[in-house]
């Protein structure tokens, strides 16, 4: 019984140390002084034109956030679709309520103008 816990412990130590060791090594082996070339934006090997820091509209992030939210909701609907015959009326009611809440969120985003591109 103790051997099983030892294997789990060894696995956890290996799983934690596997990504941490390269990060620590990179931290100590990297060059300490950044050069102006390293802080500039890379544009296909050409000299940077204009300011290096580009501002993005918040609208792009709102679209990305809405996509992630609705994508995750579709993942939550997959088990219900697989077990559709087994869940019965209670599962149908629960999924309908879930979809109505999703639709309400979509309407809210639409009315607030989060889906307007311009």
From Swiss-Prot:
Instruction: Name the UniProt key words of this record, in alphabetical order.
Output: Cell membrane, Membrane, NAD, Quinone, Translocase, Transmembrane, Transmembrane helix, Transport, Ubiquinone
Q: What Gene3D superfamilies does the entry give?
A: NADH:ubiquinone/plastoquinone oxidoreductase, chain 3
Cleaved signal peptide residues: none
Q: What is its EC number?
A: 7.1.1.-
Record GO cellular component, one term: NADH dehydrogenase complex
Q: Where in the cell is it found?
A: Cell membrane
Q: List the disulfide bonds.
A: none
Q: How does it assemble?
A: NDH-1 is composed of 14 different subunits. Subunits NuoA, H, J, K, L, M, N constitute the membrane sector of the complex.
Q: Mind telling me which PANTHER family this protein's record contains?
A: NADH-UBIQUINONE OXIDOREDUCTASE CHAIN 3
Q: What is the purpose of this protein?
A: NDH-1 shuttles electrons from NADH, via FMN and iron-sulfur (Fe-S) centers, to quinones in the respiratory chain. The immediate electron acceptor for the enzyme in this species is believed to be ubiquinone. Couples the redox reaction to proton translocation (for every two electrons transferred, four hydrogen ions are translocated across the cytoplasmic membrane), and thus conserves the redox energy in a proton gradient.
Q: What is this protein called?
A: NADH-quinone oxidoreductase subunit A
Point out the gene that encodes the protein: nuoA
């Amino acid at each position: 019984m103790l051997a099983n816990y030892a294997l789990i412990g060894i696995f956890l130590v290996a799983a934690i140390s596997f990504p941490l060791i390269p990060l620590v090594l990179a931290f100590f082996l990297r060059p300490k002084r950044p050069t102006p070339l390293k802080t500039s934006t890379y544009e296909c090997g050409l000299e940077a034109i204009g300011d290096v820091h580009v501002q993005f509209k918040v609208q792009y992030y709102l679209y990305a956030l809405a996509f992630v939210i609705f994508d995750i909701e579709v993942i939550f609907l997959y088990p219900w679709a697989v077990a559709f015959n087994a869940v019965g009326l209670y599962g149908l009611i629960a999924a309908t309520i879930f979809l109505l809440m999703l639709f309400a969120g979509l309407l809210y985003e639409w009315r607030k103008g989060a889906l307007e591109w311009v």
